[in-house]
Regions:
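Buried hydrophobic packing residues in well-ordered domains
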Residues: 45, 66, 104, 129, ...
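Bacterial N-terminal signal peptides that target proteins for export
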Residues: 1-9
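Catalytic-core regions of hydrolytic enzymes
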Residues: 136-281, 290-302, 358, 419
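Active-site-adjacent mobile loop/cap segments within catalytic or ligand-binding domains
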Residues: 53-55, 66, 285-381, 420
Length: 439
């Protein structure tokens, strides 16, 4: 009798479990989004839970298939047309009772990187699919290195944020990523008008570039100056004005600078970066951490504030310092400009205004050009068109204030090659008067 009662109870519990909702409910796919860059496409799948997935590739035609387990969508099957350099279409629909299938129709074979991200701030659980055309990645790198061999001076302008990472948002719905990109393009046009100078952007559209990649781009171009553009935000709508920040390896100049650096450094987490590979930003000790380059950055920052003061409200009269990742590994004078508080209605209206953007770009261009000219005269370098000198196995006598970065560029070689050939320390520090063997 007891055994029969036990069986009856078990059957009842089993039947009830069919009707009682459980924690094992399928995850909901709420959206599928994408961003196109010159050499890659990023696809992001949003969901209400952490995603379990499997991937495989198919040929003739080339496709990447992503199966999302225990999932359903809040929308019907859909087809998203992209038609960029990497992807034709995205198709998503129900594969079987428990699986949603994402099929990505590729232009050519790609190098894919798929990873998940947990909830972060206002971002949901995400599945990120990065598709890189290795041929286009290599072409872009070669093009940047080719510019490095030119004799003209190069200023790399870095429009902050982009793609998934919108940055700060104003009360009128203004995205920081859009404002700084528009300003960066105007700044580039102003710089390019000056003979002997050329400006390049770390991104030219609405797509995400990791902080480490921005640094790498500046290196490949052989930048003489690095300017990162951002907008600030504050809980108080009354706070406004522009400010300039430089790198500090010894802690922030104040708590506000520290908090700002933490916010800007969070860009990778918001934009979506997988940290499976080793990151060396914190361990790199090169010319920038030497006193001369840091002082040059502070001097440049002060000149920028003086110039901007003629066209804009200034919040802090002197540059502040903190551990900004995007400034941490460049070997040239580097600053981060907060062009205003997008949380303030007056600043937001100004930053949206094309005439003001041009006025600000002209001010930044004038100061940047003057500063590079000043450094060139100090270091005994002529700003002109043409190509770099060839080493041909000769010897170079290091001048005061000269860095390995600049020497390598002048002789169309690399810092690593100079370090190897001259048995230098990996910090890259070199003293004036030293004779360097050239490759």
């Amino acid at each position: 009798m007891a055994r029969r009662t036990l069986i009856t109870v078990c059957v009842i519990f089993f039947l009830l479990s069919l009707y009682i909702p459980s924690n094992g409910a399928p995850l909901k796919i709420t959206d599928v989004r994408y961003w196109s860059a010159p050499d890659h496409t990023r696809i992001v799948v949003d969901s209400d839970k952490s995603i379990s997935y499997q991937t495989f590739q198919l040929k003739d035609p080339w496709r990447l298939v992503v199966d999302i387990k225990e999932a359903k969508a809040t929308f019907d099957s859909r087809k998203i047309t992209i038609e960029d350099s990497t992807v034709h279409h995205i198709r998503i629909g129900k594969f079987d009772r428990k699986t949603m299938r994402l099929v990505i129709d590729l232009v050519k074979p790609t190098q894919s990187k798929v990873f998940t991200l947990n909830k972060y701030l206002d971002k949901p659980y995400r599945l990120v699919i990065d598709l890189h055309r290795t041929d286009l990645v290599e072409e872009g790198k070669k093009a940047r290195l080719k510019q490095k061999s030119k004799k003209y001076k190069i200023i790399v302008v870095d429009p902050g944020h982009g793609g998934e990472d919108s940055g700060a948002v104003g009360s009128r719905g203004t995205f920081e990523k859009n404002v700084v990109l528009a300003l960066a393009k105007k700044l580039k046009r102003c710089i390019d008008q000056k003979k002997g100078f050329k400006a390049f952007l770390t991104r030219e559209g609405d797509y995400f570039v990791p902080l480490e990649k921005r640094v790498e781009i500046a290196r490949e171009y052989g930048a003489d100056l690095f300017v990162s553009l951002h907008t600030d935000a504050n809980f108080s709508k009354r706070v406004r004005g522009a400010s300039v920040y430089c790198l500090s390896t010894k802690g922030a100049s104040d708590e506000a600078a520290k908090l700002l650096a933490e916010r800007e450094n969070a860009s990778d987490f918001i934009g979506g970066v997988s940290y499976a590979s080793n990151r060396d930003l914190d361990s790199i000790l090169i010319d920038l951490v030497q006193t001369q380059t840091t002082n040059d950055s502070l001097r440049f920052g002060g000149m920028v504030l003086n110039g901007m003061g003629n066209v804009h409200t200034i919040k802090f009269k002197r540059p502040k310092q903190a551990g900004f990742a995007v400034l941490r590994a460049t070997e040239v004078p580097s600053i981060l400009i907060e062009t205003g508080f997008i949380s303030n209605r007056d600043d937001e209206n100004l930053l949206r205004n094309k005439s003001f953007q041009l006025k600000l770009a002209k001010s930044l261009s004038k100061v940047s050009l003057n500063f590079v000219d000043m450094l060139a005269k100090r270091d005994g370098i002529t700003v002109s068109d043409g190509t770099a000198r060839k080493g041909k196995g000769g010897v170079h006598l290091v001048k005061p204030h000269e860095t390995l970065w600049r020497i390598a560029r002048d002789y169309n070689t690399t810092v690593d090659e100079l370090i190897r050939l001259n048995n230098l320390k990996k910090s890259g520090h070199v003293r004036a008067g030293k004779k360097l063997l050239l490759p």
